[in-house]
Amino acid sequence: MAPGRELGAFLLALLAFCGGRRLAEAAGGPGGRRGAAADACGGRGLSSVTKSNGLLNITFKYDNCTPYLNSVGKHVIGDVQNITISQYACYEQVAVTILWTANAIGIEYLRGFRVILEELKSEGRQCQQMVLRDPKQLSPSFKRTGMESNPFANLKFETDYFVKIVPFPSIKNESNYHPFFFRTRPCELLLQPENLICKPYWKPRNLNVTQQGFNMQVSFDHAPHNFGFRYYFLHYKLKHEGPFKQKTCKQDQNTDTTSCILQNVTPGDYIIELVDDTNTTRKTMHYALKPVHSPWAGPIRAIAITVPLVVISAFATLFTVMCRKKQQENIYSHLDEESSESSAYGAGLPVERLRPRPKVFICYSSKDCQKHINVIQCFAYFLQDFCGCEVALDLWEDLKICKESQKEWLIKKINESQFIIIVCSKGMKYFVEKKNWKHRGVTKDTGKGELFLFAVFTVAEKLRQAKQNSNDLCKFIAVYFDYSCEGDIPGILDLSTKYKLMDNLPQLYSHLHSRDLSVQDSEVFPVNVSKRNYFRSKSGRSLYVAICNMHQFIDQEPDWFEKQFIPFLPHPLHYSEPVMEKFDSGLVLNDLVNKQAADDDFYLKTDVNIISAGSSDSHCIIQHLNLGEDVETQDIQRGGSSVLRPLLHAVKASNLKDMPRDSGIYDSSVPSSELSLPLMEGLLTDQTETSSITGSVSSSSGLGEEEPPVITSTKFLLPGICKAELHCHIHTDELQAIAPL
């Protein structure tokens, strides 16, 4: 029994040894993926930096660099250290294995390495990718653990190379990691000295390339006869194209040089390589083959290029002229003709003037650009002249606002008006929402002290009360022009009626006259009000041009609002000298400078005093709003005085006696708003000549003939100071005459 037991134990031990060896080969361990290549190369030069030294082992998944992993990270990983090169022979060529240790900087973020080997004077490049397998994350204790790559084979003897080891993911890119330069050993050191590979081999002293039309002639001095070369091979290709093409050259027996002709090659930069039939001789050069210019190439090419360009240009010019002509016909077809339709429309105007004119108050943002202000002025004049409305606009009533105070005038107009039109824009949306954010605890907004915010919140409160009391909400209208969008309407105005101008112009016209018209009387008013013909009138043409100018401004500067207000840096309010502003039309406008009083501008006590003179519902509105401006008013009062802005800007008239009439006097033959119309800029020359009628002064009631105004000299009002006692001191000065519109 004893010998049997000993034999069984021996067989079990032998089986365990063989099975354990197979499992070890399957697992691989450190450098397991390079085992096959290392065995093929005899296992020479393998590193044992991680073996039998008591350090922690690391395993990697080895592959080439084709599977792309994002190498960009958020942390810095330092350069590897202690780079060593292990060289050995593999299939009668040089093979190397690179060894290194990781840097402690960023080692916890390390996920792998890219090992890039490149010949110093060639374009050849080899790359290996090592992805960390175990452990998943390294700690600083691994900084002394050695790491090694798979063998890089097929290298040349006595050739300069450099290796670059790039850890990833790192915030540094490949170019920020330093290369390690080395030179491969001679053939005699890696192979036996008697090996044929290590014997001296021949290289041609001269390799010349000449161009012969579309052909290249390659000449070189061939090897002596005792070398036994019978053929030479020319490998050539364009620099950035695919594999080499091959041309076989037979050695000339009677000369010392051999020539080969490469026929019908494409012009470009070529790489030419000379190889003998035993593949031991190799010499490379670059040559740029220039294009061939035949005697007829220039004229024929010029004709072939010029004629199509001329034809295309002619068609493009003709198409442009036709489109322009058609556009002019569509827009201005009715401006120069005395048609029966125009006569009927002109005859119908006096009948329309006999009807009650609905009172309209316009509220808008003073924080948008000057082009938007021009649109507001032209829109107000259009409502008054074309739509038969009695318009209240702060730009037309500076003197009255100065006498009554801004908020008193504002509340009065809101209460008196039959309709309140809020022109919504990007600026209104932005600053109204900023005001709401400030009430929720956010930092102070940049729109404090702007009267249009007070107007918007007052209208919103009236809208809310009308909703609660089940009153008619048609008084409140929110409009936006086509250079804005419906999203520019503040959320507090959602209950109002919304119109897009000028697309919904007929609906707005019907809305404004809905209280004065019955179904039987509707034909008295013009029925041809639409987006396509509103510019037939003088006021409509001015509005059309102002909208076009705003479109052109937005096309030139799409981010004009963001540049101006986002982020908006607030600056302390202080009294400043009046600054002259200039509209695009050439009219010089001044802002009205008001002296800050203790009971002025967004102060709750003053609001109560002002509203007590008005209606009782206004009192409730202001108490409910309580715009949170007490702190702001104290800051402003500490600053001394401030600039009180009207809803937009103030337009100054020529003389005190010629000041624009307020909104309560619209029966005159000349509307007061005509003094502030912008010029029709942005049109073509012929369109400007056609539309020059916009410069004439016409009767809003259709009476009288149009005569161009002749302005010889004009007096403009310099900014006055409104004191707390509501006394307005106006100073006049002589200014230079302004050319007529």
Swiss-Prot record:
What range(s) does the SEFIR domain occupy? 357-510
Mapped to this chain, the residue ranges on the Cytoplasmic side of the membrane are 323-741
Question: Which positions, given as ranges, span the membrane?
Answer: 302-322
User: MF terms per GO, please?
Assistant: interleukin-17 receptor activity
Q: Which Pfam families does the UniProt record give?
A: IL17R_D_N (PF16742), SEFIR (PF08357)
Q: Which UniProt keywords apply?
A: Glycoprotein, Membrane, Receptor, Signal, Transmembrane, Transmembrane helix
One Gene Ontology cellular component term attached to this UniProt record is: membrane
Q: Where are the annotated segments for Disordered?
A: 688-708
Stretches with biased composition (Low complexity):
688-703
How far does the signal peptide extend, from start to end residue?
1-26
Extracellular face of the membrane: 27-301
Functionally, this protein is described as follows: Feedback inhibitor of fibroblast growth factor mediated Ras-MAPK signaling and ERK activation. May inhibit FGF-induced FGFR1 tyrosine phosphorylation. Inhibits TGFB-induced epithelial-to-mesenchymal transition in lens epithelial cells.
Q: What is this protein called?
A: Interleukin-17 receptor D
The protein's gene is named IL17RD
